[in-house]
Amino acid sequence: MTKAIQKIGSRRNGRIASRKNGRRIPKGVIHVQASFNNTIVTVTDVRGQVVSWSSAGTCGFRGTRRGTPFAAQTAAANAIRTVVDQGMQRAEVMIKGPGLGRDAALRAIRRSGILLSFVRDVTPMPHNGCRPPKKRRV
């Protein structure tokens, strides 16, 4: 006679449950990717697991308004609001890209009350790599 195998729950259900319970995150890394068209703010723990993220597009900005400093400020405040509730006190900031939202996002992060260990610019710079596209003629 075979024993019935108990189903504890699928892997997917367990993952959702672990995401819902707000585990305490004292320290994290805030990644700001600022392009000319959009600004994406991702908050991870020190191991690199994504805790929260937001972008100007998810905050309701559409078209050219996504690249504005105000949209970046709103996206940063939106991403940080959830991790402050989970107890984040210290963070490192990595800023990537040439966009207008760089400074506005950093200002919003400073205003949130999280202590910043350091702010690092991680924009990739080529050591004369690929040939750039030809200049636009308007």
Curated annotation (Swiss-Prot):
Compositional bias segments (type: Basic residues): 9-21
Molecular function GO labels: rRNA binding; structural constituent of ribosome
Protein keywords: Chloroplast, Plastid, Ribonucleoprotein, Ribosomal protein, RNA-binding, rRNA-binding
Region of interest called Disordered, as start-end residue ranges on this chain: 1-21
Biological process (GO), any one: translation
Main localization, broad class: plastid
Subcellular location: Plastid, Chloroplast
Superkingdom: Eukaryota
A family per Pfam: Ribosomal_S11
Record GO cellular component, one term: ribonucleoprotein complex
Family statement: Belongs to the universal ribosomal protein uS11 family.
Matching PANTHER family: 40S RIBOSOMAL PROTEIN S14/30S RIBOSOMAL PROTEIN S11 (PTHR11759)
Subunit structure comment from the entry: Part of the 30S ribosomal subunit.
Name of the protein in question: Small ribosomal subunit protein uS11c
Record organism: Ceratophyllum demersum (Rigid hornwort)
Gene from which this protein is expressed: rps11
